[in-house]
């Protein structure tokens, strides 16, 4: 299948991006952890990918770091968890933070990630605890400048499963000091986990 793509970033709007590889545009869904570090549109990018085929759809997911792709795949092995929740995990916490939450059994923090309830968090801890030490992240998080960071962050938070009013409040609170889109989103998600 498709394991990696190298091309020009043609489009990015969370959670979607398009990479032009030899004139073919590959549409991928990606977690916010990937969006934080993406280059500007028109620049070269290399993404690790996960190809998923269901009865009625085909999906391609993109990750800047191999550790994120590995975590995405491992989280989906937990009973009752699919791609949407796996993306929410990677959008809500770093790979290292997730490993710490699993190792320590922090159910409360896990339930703050959209789509994860108490029972799902407990299942995750039980089923992933042995593999948590193998999770590895990569480079530090950086962002992209945007003309309206709060507006873009609100849209991104809605795509992650937050209700419109809640997403707007989170983005407003996190963006009070201004800053890049990725910074506003990261601050909002970190505040939600507290």
From Swiss-Prot:
Region (Domain I): 1-64
Chain positions covered by the region annotation Domain II: 65-140
Localization in the cell: Cytoplasm
Residue intervals passing through the bilayer: none
Family annotation (InterPro entries): DNA_helicase_Holl-junc_RuvA_I, Hlx-hairpin-Hlx_DNA-bd_motif, NA-bd_OB-fold, RuvA, RuvA_2-like, RuvA_C, RuvA_C_sf
SUPFAM superfamilies assigned: DNA helicase RuvA subunit, C-terminal domain, Nucleic acid-binding proteins, RuvA domain 2-like
UniProt keyword terms in alphabetical order: Cytoplasm, DNA damage, DNA recombination, DNA repair, DNA-binding
GO BP annotations, alphabetical order: DNA recombination; DNA repair
MF terms (GO), sorted A to Z: ATP binding; four-way junction DNA binding; four-way junction helicase activity
Purpose of the protein: The RuvA-RuvB-RuvC complex processes Holliday junction (HJ) DNA during genetic recombination and DNA repair, while the RuvA-RuvB complex plays an important role in the rescue of blocked DNA replication forks via replication fork reversal (RFR). RuvA specifically binds to HJ cruciform DNA, conferring on it an open structure. The RuvB hexamer acts as an ATP-dependent pump, pulling dsDNA into and through the RuvAB complex. HJ branch migration allows RuvC to scan DNA until it finds its consensus sequence, where it cleaves and resolves the cruciform DNA.
Membership in a protein family: Belongs to the RuvA family.
NCBIfam families: ruvA (TIGR00084)
Assembly notes: Homotetramer. Forms an RuvA(8)-RuvB(12)-Holliday junction (HJ) complex. HJ DNA is sandwiched between 2 RuvA tetramers; dsDNA enters through RuvA and exits via RuvB. An RuvB hexamer assembles on each DNA strand where it exits the tetramer. Each RuvB hexamer is contacted by two RuvA subunits (via domain III) on 2 adjacent RuvB subunits; this complex drives branch migration. In the full resolvosome a probable DNA-RuvA(4)-RuvB(12)-RuvC(2) complex forms which resolves the HJ.
UniProt protein name: Holliday junction branch migration complex subunit RuvA
Organism of provenance: Xanthomonas oryzae pv. oryzae (strain KACC10331 / KXO85)
């Amino acid at each position: 299948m498709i394991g990696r793509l190298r091309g020009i970033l043609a489009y990015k709007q969370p959670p979607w991006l398009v990479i032009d590889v030899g004139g073919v545009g590959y549409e991928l869904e990606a977690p916010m952890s990937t969006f934080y570090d993406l280059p500007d549109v028109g620049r070269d990018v290399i993404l690790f990918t996960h190809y998923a085929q269901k009865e009625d759809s085909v999906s391609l997911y993109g990750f800047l770091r191999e550790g994120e792709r590995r975590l995405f795949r491992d989280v989906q092995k937990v009973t009752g968890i699919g791609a949407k929740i796996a993306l929410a995990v990677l959008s809500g916490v770093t790979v290292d933070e997730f490993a710490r939450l699993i190792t320590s059994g922090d159910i409360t923090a896990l339930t703050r990630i959209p789509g994860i309830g108490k029972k799902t968090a407990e299942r995750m801890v039980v089923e992933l605890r042995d593999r948590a030490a193998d999770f590895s992240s990569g480079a530090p998080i950086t962002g992209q400048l945007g003309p309206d960071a709060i507006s873009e962050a609100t849209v991104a938070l809605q795509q992650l499963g937050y209700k419109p009013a809640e997403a707007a409040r989170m983005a407003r609170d996190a963006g009070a000091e201004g800053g890049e889109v990725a910074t506003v989103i990261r601050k909002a998600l970190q505040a939600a986990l507290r």
